[in-house]
């Protein structure tokens, strides 16, 4: 899965907007949305919010966690443990879409960008460390990681698969050499 695919999936998350127009209910595959009344907050999928925002038909109301204070708490919590802290689902994708399409609707957008990047850096470092430890294990062939997001899985997936294949090839070569050495020793003894 690519970051773009993760962002596409995140587009189905529901978020509040303040529409700047009036419109009856919309009947979409994902469900009915509306009616829209100018100035009255309404919940819509993020992809609709972004589309309306691009056309300047609404302002997007940031989720409660997308503010400096809450992000600061998440960064501090993430720093305080080796385990992955619980973060909002699609935090990176939603923050990215806000900064890209609705920066004006996001108070302190520059500081928010810094805290989201800091949170990502801390979590990706943990992912890399966890992956290294996992790949260094001889006996175990599975791992459990709690509280990681889809984007983080996409980030680490390719390198884990590549490294696992390399380790498998090395193990195969090692076993072939070991069996060849043991057969060579039989000829010497006999």
Swiss-Prot record:
Segments crossing the lipid bilayer: none
CDD domains: GINS_A_psf2, GINS_B_Psf2
Keywords on record: DNA replication, Nucleus
InterPro entries the UniProt entry points to: GINS_A, GINS_bundle-like_dom_sf, GINS_Psf2, PSF2_N
GO cellular component: GINS complex
Name of a matching Pfam family: Sld5
Single GO biological process annotation from the record: DNA replication
Compartments (UniProt record): Nucleus
Known role: The GINS complex plays an essential role in the initiation of DNA replication.
PANTHER family with a match to the protein in the record: DNA REPLICATION COMPLEX GINS PROTEIN PSF2 (PTHR12772:SF0)
Subunit structure: Component of the GINS complex which is a heterotetramer of gins1, gins2, gins3 and gins4.
Family membership: Belongs to the GINS2/PSF2 family.
Name of the molecule in the record: Probable DNA replication complex GINS protein PSF2
Organism whose genome encodes this protein: Brugia malayi (Filarial nematode worm)
């Amino acid at each position: 899965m690519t970051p773009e695919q993760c962002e596409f999936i995140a587009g189905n998350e529901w978020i509040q907007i303040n529409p700047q127009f009036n419109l009856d209910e919309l009947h979409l595959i994902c469900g009915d949305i509306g009616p829209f009344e100018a100035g009255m907050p309404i919940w819509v999928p993020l992809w609709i919010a972004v589309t309306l925002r691009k056309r300047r038909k609404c302002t997007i109301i940031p989720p409660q966690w997308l503010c400096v204070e809450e992000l600061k708490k998440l960064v501090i919590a993430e720093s305080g443990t080796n385990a992955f802290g619980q973060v909002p689902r699609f935090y990176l994708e939603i923050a990215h879409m806000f900064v890209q399409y609705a920066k004006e609707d996001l108070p302190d957008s520059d500081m928010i960008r810094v805290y989201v990047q800091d949170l990502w850096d801390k979590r990706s470092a943990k992912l890399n460390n966890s992956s290294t430890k996992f790949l260094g294990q001889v006996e175990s062939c599975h791992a459990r990681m709690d509280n990681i997001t889809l984007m983080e899985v996409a980030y680490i997936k390719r390198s884990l698969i590549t490294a696992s294949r390399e380790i498998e090839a090395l193990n195969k070569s090692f076993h072939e050499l070991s069996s060849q050495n043991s057969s060579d020793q039989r000829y010497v003894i006999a």
